[in-house]
C-alpha cells in the first residue's frame, strides 16, 4: 500500500472532458437531485459503523474509527454525493479520479469497505439492486466480435507504460513468494524470483518437460512461454493484444527461443491441434461468465490423452459472484471491459457439466496477490512523472492507483482470492 500526501487532489477544471467525460462533468438533473441526499445519508450511516474516519471540508469528522483508523478526506462533498447518487460504486471511483476525496492510505480505506461490502447497503435496497445498478453493455460481452477490442482497451495501453511498474520478467499476475509468514513484507528484490516460482509451479502442475507440446492461452509478455521452452517444450501461445504479441516475440527472440515458441494473434476459441499441456494465467477473468463453458470446452478439446491443464484464476465467493454477475462496475468501465471473476464452485460446476475435465489440485494464494499489488502500486506511484511523459495524465495516475489499491484491498479483506488449479480428465489416473 502507498501512503499519499493529503491536499494534492486535481481540480475539476484541469480534467480533459473529451478524455474523461465521466470524471470531468459532475452529474446533474432530476435523478441526481433525488439520489444525492439519499447517497449522502446512506454513506454517513454506513461509515458510522466502520473502523474509519471521514473528514469533511469544515474539519468535522464522522465514522466509527479511532484517531489511528484509516482516514478518508472528502474535499467536495456535494460532488461526491452527486456522483455516488448517480452511479453508485462507479461514481465512488470516479469521485476519487476527480479528486473529490482522497486517503492517507487508500488501500486501508478501501479494505474497510471491502471487508463489509455485503452489509453496507440496507437489505431493502439490496433487494432492489436490479432496478438501479447499471447492467453490462452488450457491446462489452466477450463474443468473438467484441473480445479483441475489450482486451485491447487494457493491454494495448502501451508496453512502455506497463514497463514502468512491472519487473524485468514483465509478468502481470500474482507472484508466489517464498515466505509470507505473519508480518512478512516481501521486497522488490524478491519479485522476479517470486514470479518465476509461480510460473514454474504451474508448469510442473501441467507436466511440462522436454518434448511437451504446450498451448498457452493468454501470452502476457512471454515469460511463461520462455520458461516452458527452456524446459525443452515446444510452445504455441495465443493473445488478442497486438502490443503484447509484438513485445513477447522480441523477448522470446532475445532469449534465443524463437524456434521453440510461436506467438499468434488469435482467439483461443479458434485454436486447433492437440497439446500435452494447456496453461493459462489469469485469463478466465477476461472471458465473461457467458463464455466460461466455451473456455473450458476449448481446453478439453485441445488436450491430448493423458494431458493436463494448469490455470491461475482470480476468484470471489460464490454468493457474491451470483449477486454481481450482471452488474456493470467501475472496473468494467475503466480497467477490464467485459471481465468477470468466477468462484471456485463455478469453475468446478462448469467443468463437471460441460467437459470431461476435473479439478485435480487447487492451491489458494490470495495473500501473495495482496503483496504483489502492494509492490506494483509502490513502483507505479514512484514513477508517475514518467507515466506523464508517456502521455498518461494525472487522472490516469489516480485511476491506476485506485485500481491497484482497490484490488489489493479485495485480497487483503478476503473478498478476492487467487487459485492455481490443475485439471485432467475424469477417467485419467
Enumerate the predicted regions with their spans.
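Conserved beta-strand signature within the Rossmann-like core of class I S-adenosyl-L-methionine
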Residues: 306-314
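A short glycine-rich, Lys/Arg-flanked "PGG" loop and its adjoining helix->strand segment in the class I
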Residues: 293-305
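A short acidic, Gly/Pro-enriched loop at the edge of an enzyme's catalytic core
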Residues: 269-279
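Substrate-binding/catalytic lobe of Class I Rossmann-like enzymes that use SAM or dcSAM, i.e.
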Residues: 315-429
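Conserved class I S-adenosyl-L-methionine
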Residues: 210-218
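Class I SAM-dependent methyltransferase SAM/SAH-binding core
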Residues: 230-269
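Conserved SAM-binding loop of SAM-dependent methyltransferases across substrates and taxa
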Residues: 221-232
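Feature captures hydrophobic
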Residues: 1-195, 201-204
Amino acid at each position: 500500500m502507498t501512503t499519499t500526501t493529503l491536499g494534492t487532489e486535481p481540480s475539476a477544471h484541469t480534467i480533459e472532458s473529451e478524455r474523461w467525460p465521466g470524471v470531468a462533468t459532475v452529474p446533474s438533473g432530476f435523478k441526481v437531485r433525488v439520489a444525492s441526499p439519499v447517497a449522502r445519508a446512506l454513506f454517513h450511516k454506513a461509515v458510522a459503523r466502520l473502523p474509519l474516519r471521514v473528514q469533511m471540508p469544515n474539519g468535522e469528522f464522522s465514522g466509527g474509527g479511532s484517531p489511528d483508523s484509516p482516514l478518508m478526506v472528502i474535499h467536495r462533498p456535494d460532488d461526491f454525493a452527486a456522483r455516488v447518487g448517480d452511479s453508485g460504486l462507479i461514481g465512488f471511483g470516479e469521485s476519487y479520479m476527480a479528486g473529490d476525496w482522497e486517503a492517507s492510505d487508500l488501500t486501508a480505506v478501501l479494505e474497510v469497505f471491502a471487508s463489509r461490502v455485503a452489509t453496507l447497503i440496507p437489505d431493502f435496497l439490496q433487494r432492489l439492486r436490479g432496478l438501479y445498478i447499471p447492467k453490462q453493455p452488450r457491446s462489452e460481452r466477450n463474443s468473438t466480435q467484441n473480445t479483441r477490442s475489450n482486451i485491447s482497451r487494457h493491454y494495448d495501453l502501451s508496453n512502455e507504460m506497463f514497463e514502468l511498474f512491472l519487473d524485468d520478467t514483465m509478468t502481470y499476475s500474482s507472484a508466489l513468494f517464498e515466505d509470507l509468514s505473519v508480518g512478512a513484507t516481501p521486497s522488490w528484490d524478491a519479485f522476479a524470483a517470486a514470479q518465476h516460482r509461480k510460473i514454474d509451479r504451474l508448469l510442473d502442475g501441467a507436466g511440462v518437460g522436454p518434448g511437451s507440446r504446450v498451448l498457452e492461452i493468454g501470452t502476457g509478455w512471454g515469460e511463461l512461454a520462455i520458461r516452458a521452452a527452456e524446459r525443452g517444450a515446444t510452445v504455441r501461445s495465443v493473445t488478442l493484444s497486438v502490443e503484447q504479441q509484438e513485445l513477447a516475440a522480441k523477448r522470446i527472440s532475445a532469449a534465443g527461443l524463437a524456434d521453440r515458441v510461436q506467438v499468434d494473434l488469435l482467439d483461443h476459441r479458434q485454436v486447433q491441434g492437440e497439446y500435452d499441456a494447456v496453461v493459462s494465467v489469469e485469463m478466465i477473468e477476461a472471458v465473461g461468465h457467458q463464455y466460461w463453458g466455451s473456455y473450458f470446452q476449448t481446453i478439453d478439446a485441445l488436450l491430448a490423452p493423458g494431458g493436463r491443464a494448469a490455470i491461475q484464476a482470480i476468484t470471489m465467493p460464490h454468493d457474491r459472484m451470483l449477486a454481481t454477475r450482471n452488474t456493470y462496475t467501475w472496473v468494467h468501465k475503466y480497467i477490464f471491459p467485459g471481465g468477470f471473476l468466477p468462484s471456485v464452485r463455478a469453475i468446478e460446476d462448469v467443468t463437471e457439466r460441460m467437459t470431461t475435465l476435473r479439478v485435480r489440485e487447487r492451491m489458494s494464494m490470495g495473500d501473495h496477490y495482496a503483496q504483489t499489488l502492494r509492490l506494483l502500486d509502490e513502483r507505479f506511484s514512484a514513477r508517475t512523472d514518467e507515466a506523464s511523459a508517456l502521455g498518461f495524465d494525472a487522472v490516469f495516475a489516480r485511476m491506476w492507483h485506485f485500481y491497484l489499491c482497490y484490488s489489493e484491498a479485495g485480497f487483503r479483506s478476503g473478498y478476492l482470492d487467487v487459485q492455481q488449479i490443475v485439471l485432467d480428465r475424469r477417467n485419467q489416473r
